[in-house]
Amino acid sequence: MPITDAIFLMGEVREKPLHVGGLQLFRPPEDAGPDVVSAGYRAAIEHGEVGTLFRRYPRRMLGGLGPWAWNEDENLDLEYHVRHSALPHPGQIRELLALVSRLHGTLLDRNRPLWEMHLIEGLADGRVATYSKVHHSLLDGVAAMRWMVRGLSSDPDERDMPPPWAPPERPRPSVPSGGPADAVRGLARDVVEGGKAVGEASLATVRTLARSLEDRAASLPYQAPRSMFNVPITGARRFAAESWDLERVRALADTTGGSVNDVVLAMSAGALRRYLLDHDALPQQPLVSAVPVSLRGGEEEAETGNAVGVVLCNLGTHLEDPVARFDLIHRSMRDSKAQLQGLGPMAVILLSALNFGPVALGPLYRYELLQKPAFNVIISNVPGPEKPLYWNGARLEGIYPVSIPYDGQALNITVTSYAGSLEFGLIGCRRRVPRLQRLLDHLEDSLAELEQAA
């Protein structure tokens, strides 16, 4: 198992589960009966076939002293991994989000393949929901999105579709667990590749330091102010979600000369500023966001494991003027992306580890030992499908990412695009981020404020 995947197993403890998830909302077809969820659950369980990825569970080699590797469960219990739930009355979105919050706070069983899917009925408007979670060591956000989309169809009339855990039509080669010799060879290869990457990453670090002396928009690691989000966390979670019109955001990006992601960051920055002012907790220095950058190419590349770099963005939360804040964010992201130009994937990962490694491994040491956090919040934008999708005739109406709070990073904002919408998923430590749902109102206020000013 690559170290970029194993780090999520090494850093996980009971209070800090390290799985990613997603909430999907479906509108059943008009001819669906009242038992549509029960029938779908039975059909999924009876399908039987499970792809290699969804049979993997982790183990330590060399009697527990060696590196992590994957085993395959030959007797997988689908009824354990796939579950059927119903919401309590009155069956509003509030009850659904409360259920997802509880489900996302529990660890996955490492003695079994590291995934679950919950089929949920009882919404008053007739829609049905699915909540799925998979360990970050198995899939990153982009890979999880690709696997989810792979199990859907653009044809509303297609029926008898296999569940998302079924083997793909074109089987992928199985990844053998290997033995001690394979582990040693893999480590040696990593050392050689890592040596080259160290040189590239060192040069990039020097360029970043030089740029920070010239441009106040530049963000250096471990120079972010402490905030109410940068504290040790507990295991309980709170989840909130909302959709925005993608064309509205694109129009604003065109007006301001930025990108959709710049607007997403500006919305988030304005919302965080308002939220912190509500709690009389806004630092004088600007908050800094970690922004994941996918290192994956086309669909032909591997769709498992982790291939993500991290750049830093100055959120300009010290600025009251929304346009000045947006301009600062735009410059900061431009400079951070320029830092990665010409670097190989390993060098990008190594450079990112300077920022993110201590966060992922937070449970292994006392977070409070860091005088300043590397960043204050993670804001991620995962591209999603552009056209409407269906599963056995049920239209996918919403897809909301459910990510990970880390020790010292009590809030995560993840966004995905789908069929003309931007879907925001906010996940936070229930104890450390009170009234998290207020951030949804602040996101709308922040967007409207920037529209009016621009």
Residue spans of the language-model regions?
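Soluble acyl-CoA-dependent acyltransferase catalytic core bearing the H(X)4D motif
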Residues: 1-4, 23-409, 413-444, 448-454
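Generic start-of-chain signal for non-secretory N-termini
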Residues: 1-19
